[in-house]
Amino acid sequence: MMTEYIRISGIVTEIHWINPHSWIFLEVTDAEGGSAVWALEGASVTELRRRGWVEDSVEPGDRISARCHQLRDRSNGCLLGYVTPEGGEEKLFD
């Protein structure tokens, strides 16, 4: 069971509104100034629409923060929990 969230922030490089799972690719800058792209897996498009998300809610170039469950191998990937667009409210994305 995944119970621990990490919080990451960055710039959206790609977003895929597809079924059965949506994907956000996020360029994240670390404390040393290096950057890496993280793959964030979210709910299906159908489920996201039920929660009030639409295709232009998050777009490439947007700055977002996310609370997600990092992959067990600690690579740059997460199962999304919540997304907060810059200047917006945190909403469930899974």
Where in the sequence are the language-model features?
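Short, glycine/small-residue-enriched coil/turn segments at secondary-structure junctions
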Residues: 1-18
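Short nucleic-acid-contacting surface segments enriched for D/E, G, S/T with interspersed K/R
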Residues: 49-66
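OB-fold/S1-family single-stranded nucleic acid-binding modules
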Residues: 71-94
